[in-house]
């Protein structure tokens, strides 16, 4: 398996003649330091892996100092910089041009989680209400985007634009973490100015037409009474003296017959 994978990467190793190492231990990465070139890379790897070890929790892929991914055949972990000699022999790809296929089933978790994170950020950016408490502390940029979205929906949503204290307090209190408090405070101060301006408006301005609202706002869809009454008259529901929900005790044929007779008494003969 490893020889086949090494043959696919022919001619791309910087420290081997014709692309392959001489010694099989060096080729498989079993030695402590496979080559002098790899020994020079160990010093920047210590600081890089110490920083990335807190954010990357995937066992199959291991970030390298050259922005490549080393896929291990055994369960790899994010450790110092030295290759784990106690584990199974692992084929190491230190070149960033070659991305090895995932050997185990855990290898697909990295792109899948990145896609899921992209979908979550897209959902949070388009949602009208603040859900900053659902976001982890590792994404302060998403918190800034959500605060900007709250400013966009400040004037469109009549439920949250009543006074100056509601948007300002929600912008500063719902943002988690130390980094989020600064962004929440900024959004709260900007929202308080817009809220105080909208609080002086008359009550009729709060009833915004549904065409001016964004399509994501579901619970602010208003129903016109004239349109509703025209539908009731058109369907003949005003001539029915008893509601159809009260006829659930009878069978379906009797219900449909009585319903049609009451709706059109002159056309249908029972």
From Swiss-Prot:
InterPro entries: CITED. One of its GO terms (cellular component) is nucleus. PANTHER family: CBP_P300-INTERACTING TRANSACTIVATOR 2, MELANOCYTE SPECIFIC GENE RELATED CITED. Keywords: Activator, Atrial septal defect, Developmental protein, Differentiation, Disease variant, Nucleus, Repressor, Stress response, Transcription, Transcription regulation. It comes from Homo sapiens (Human). One of its GO terms (molecular function) is protein domain specific binding. This is Cbp/p300-interacting transactivator 2. Its main location: nucleus. The lineage of its organism: Eukaryota, Metazoa, Chordata, Craniata, Vertebrata. Belongs to the CITED family. Residues 165-198 have a biased composition (Gly residues). Induction: By hypoxia and deferoxamine. Residues 138-201 are annotated as: Disordered. Disulfide bonds: none annotated. The keyword DNA repair does not apply. It is linked to Ventricular septal defect 2: A common form of congenital cardiovascular anomaly that may occur alone or in combination with other cardiac malformations. It can affect any portion of the ventricular septum, resulting in abnormal communications between the two lower chambers of the heart. Classification is based on location of the communication, such as perimembranous, inlet, outlet (infundibular), central muscular, marginal muscular, or apical muscular defect. Atrial septal defect 8: A congenital heart malformation characterized by incomplete closure of the wall between the atria resulting in blood flow from the left to the right atria.
């Amino acid at each position: 398996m490893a020889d086949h994978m090494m043959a696919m990467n022919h001619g791309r190793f910087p420290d081997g003649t014709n692309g392959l190492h001489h010694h099989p231990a060096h080729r498989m990465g079993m030695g402590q330091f496979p080559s002098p070139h790899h020994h020079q890379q160990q010093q920047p790897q210590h600081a890089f892996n110490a920083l990335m070890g807190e954010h990357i929790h995937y066992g199959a892929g291991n970030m390298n100092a050259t922005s490549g991914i080393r896929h291990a055949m055994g369960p790899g972990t994010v450790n110092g910089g030295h290759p784990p000699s106690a584990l199974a022999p692992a084929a190491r790809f230190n070149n960033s041009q070659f991305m090895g296929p995932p050997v185990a089933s855990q290898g697909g978790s990295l792109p899948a989680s990145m896609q899921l994170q992209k979908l979550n950020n897209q959902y949070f950016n388009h949602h009208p209400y603040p859900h900053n408490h659902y976001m982890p502390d590792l994404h302060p940029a998403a918190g800034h985007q959500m605060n900007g979205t709250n400013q966009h929906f400040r004037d469109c949503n009549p439920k949250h634009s009543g006074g100056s204290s509601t948007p300002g307090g929600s912008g500063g209190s719902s943002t988690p973490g130390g980094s989020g408090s600064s962004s929440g405070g900024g959004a709260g101060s900007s929202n308080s100015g817009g809220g105080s301006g909208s609080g002086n408006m008359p009550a009729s301005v709060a009833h915004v037409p549904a065409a001016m609202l964004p399509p994501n706002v579901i619970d602010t869809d208003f129903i016109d009474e004239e349109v509703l009454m025209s539908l009731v008259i058109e369907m003949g529901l005003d001539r029915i003296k008893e509601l159809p929900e009260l006829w659930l005790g009878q069978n379906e044929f009797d219900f449909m017959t009585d319903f049609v007779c009451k709706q059109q008494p002159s056309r249908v003969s029972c």
